[in-house]
């Protein structure tokens, strides 16, 4: 369907979109470094000052996430040496929800990096996957998001990989995370966040992202404090509230 829609786009459609959507009024520009605000503004308006002033109305998302349901799909792709697996479900909240950070931390502990549970067990201990992880997606600009697990497996051990992955999800859901895990991942997330701003490009990108999401400049300093403030009970409660291991949807693709 997406391929068909892209194929129908004409050159005139692009010109029309640019004319209707591009202009001053809604544009946001960020810069970081040895920059004079006065000189910067002067150069910007010299470059695009003749653009018309347009306030682009971004439609509010009103459609809510569907209720989670158990299901599976197999997509057969010939001559593939590996198979890809996605498991997930909607969470029904966006990034501004009060439970977002707690749930994000819980899912990061499950599969957010190389030292997370899924990589340590399904990959390193059991040797069943080339790579596996979990994350929250689709939560920006008021959208109800979802959480998912992804993994890459040899087709002949995909079934074992699925079983091992679900075993870790059940353990994570039923037993929760530990204080040591939470402390370690808080350090990782806050550290990565700070490192991402160690260049002028990274700092400008963060400032622009915050502006696009309607956040104040102070959020640059607030984010690590928010992460640090999340308690163990908040994370484990969020996992119980927004995850249902009995209603996961699974899609696998490959030579199966």
Q: Can you say where each PLM-predicted feature lies in the sequence?
A:
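Helix N-cap motif at beta-to-alpha junctions
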Residues: 33-38, 154-158, 255-256
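Bacterial peptidoglycan biogenesis and beta-lactam-recognition machinery
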Residues: 36-38, 47-54
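Short amphipathic alpha-helices in soluble, non-transmembrane regions
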Residues: 41-48, 162-168
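Amphipathic alpha-helical interaction elements
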Residues: 19, 32, 107-111, 170, ...
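Acidic/histidine-enriched alpha-helical segments
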Residues: 36, 55-69, 123, 139-140, ...
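C-terminal regions of mature proteins
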Residues: 28-33, 98, 180-256
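Non-catalytic beta-strand/loop surface segments
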Residues: 1-25, 50-97, 108-159, 181, ...
């Amino acid at each position: 369907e997406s391929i068909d829609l892209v194929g129908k786009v004409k050159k005139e459609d692009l010109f029309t979109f640019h004319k209707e959507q591009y202009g001053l009024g809604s544009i946001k520009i960020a810069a970081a470094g040895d920059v004079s605000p006065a000189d910067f503004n002067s150069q910007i308006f010299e470059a695009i000052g003749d653009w018309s002033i347009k306030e682009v109305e971004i439609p509010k998302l009103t459609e809510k996430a569907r209720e989670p349901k158990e299901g599976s799909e197999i997509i057969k792709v010939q001559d593939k040496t590996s198979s890809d697996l996605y498991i997930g479900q909607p969470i029904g909240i966006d990034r501004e929800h009060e439970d977002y950070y707690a749930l994000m931390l819980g899912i990061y502990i499950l599969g957010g990096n190389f030292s997370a549970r899924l990589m340590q067990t399904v990959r390193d201990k059991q040797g069943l996957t080339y790579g596996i992880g979990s994350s929250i997606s689709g939560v920006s600009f008021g959208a109800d998001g979802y959480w998912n697990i992804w993994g890459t497996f040899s087709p002949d051990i995909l079934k074992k990989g699925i079983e091992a992955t679900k075993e870790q999800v059940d353990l994570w859901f039923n037993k929760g995370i530990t204080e040591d895990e939470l402390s370690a991942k808080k350090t990782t997330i806050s550290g990565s966040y700070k490192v991402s701003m160690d260049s002028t490009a990274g700092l400008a990108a963060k400032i622009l992202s915050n502006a696009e999401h309607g956040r104040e400049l102070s959020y640059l300093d607030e984010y690590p404090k928010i992460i640090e403030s999340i308690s163990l009970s908040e994370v484990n409660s969020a996992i119980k509230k927004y995850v249902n291991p009995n209603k996961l949807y699974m899609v696998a693709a490959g030579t199966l």
